[in-house]
Design a protein with these regions (language model features):
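C-terminal ends and interior cores of transmembrane alpha-helices
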Residues: 84-99
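Juxtamembrane intracellular "pre-TM" segments in multi-pass secondary transporters
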Residues: 2-10, 190-222
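Cytoplasmic helix-loop-helix junction between adjacent transmembrane helices
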Residues: 106-144
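Pair of pore-lining "gating" transmembrane helices in MFS-fold secondary transporters
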Residues: 8-39, 110, 212-232
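Helix-loop junctions at membrane interfaces in 12-TM secondary transporters
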Residues: 10-11, 95-107
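C-terminal membrane-cytosol helix-exit motif in multi-pass small-molecule transporters
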Residues: 157-158, 177-198
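Glycine-rich segments within core transmembrane alpha-helices of 12-TM secondary carriers
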Residues: 137-157
Length: 234
């Protein structure tokens, strides 16, 4: 029975891996163009990298709401809503570039970062769809999608840069929006899942108790250092 569950869950894993490749492409596009466009749109040079910072802040801010949304409504609805919101954010970014509006562009980067918080849940959905002994393989396949995105995202951005005359790179974000819509179509093929049952009596340890654990502190510090280094390199 476990073997049957592992085999039956693999189509979902491939769907999630494909969606990961499509959605992560938008993030890599912000990494590629965020600093360049920030330098062009920012009112002062010191704010040039704010779009990249906004994306990272969006990721941090979206983590807890994403978890609550999936618990209340299920993974599939949360995935679909997030992909749609990311496509809208790409349209906002394109409009901001055409209007030479810095703050709306930063807002779009923030929303795309928040979408990343949902995209990071794809691997866990993949692990839950197969037998426990195949969870590692499922997670690895989804993570390969990010490697594909590292190539696809910048390539799409460069090739569609002049799509809209007079607004360099606005077309890049429209193309990214199309990728998010493609991800939406892929995610719509996932089977419907039931939200977690919340009875109001609570369960598990309080977040404060978890945060006091040495292991939690070490994990948070490692994440802070890793993202700080990544942001510095970007």
């Amino acid at each position: 029975e476990k073997r049957k569950r592992g085999v039956e869950g693999m189509p979902q894993v491939w769907l999630l891996a494909s969606a990961q490749a499509l959605c992560a492409s938008g993030s890599f596009l912000v990494v590629l163009l965020g600093g360049i466009l920030g330098a062009e749109l920012a009112p002062v040079p010191g704010l040039s990298t704010l779009p990249l910072a906004a994306m990272v802040l969006g990721l941090a801010a979206g983590t807890v709401p994403a978890a609550f949304a999936m618990r209340r409504y299920g993974r599939r609805p949360a995935f679909l809503a997030s992909a749609l919101l990311a496509a809208v954010a790409c349209c906002l970014a394109a409009a901001a570039i055409r209007a030479q509006a810095f703050w709306p562009f930063c807002a779009s980067a923030f929303v795309l970062g928040a979408n990343n918080a949902v995209v990071m849940q794809y691997r866990f959905a993949a692990a839950e769809s197969v037998a426990p002994e195949r969870a590692g393989q499922a997670i690895a396949l989804v993570m390969v999608g990010a490697l594909v995105a590292a190539v696809v995202g910048p390539e799409v951005g460069v090739r569609s840069a002049e799509l809209l005359a007079g607004s360099r790179f606005a077309g890049s974000f429209l193309a990214a929006g199309a990728l998010y819509l493609a991800a939406l179509a892929v995610l719509s093929r996932l089977p419907r899942d039931r939200p977690a049952i919340v009875d109001g009596r609570g369960g598990g340890r309080p977040l404060a108790a978890i945060a006091r654990q040495p292991e939690f502190v070490v994990a948070v510090l490692a994440g802070v250092v890793a993202y700080a280094v990544m942001s510095f390199i970007m």
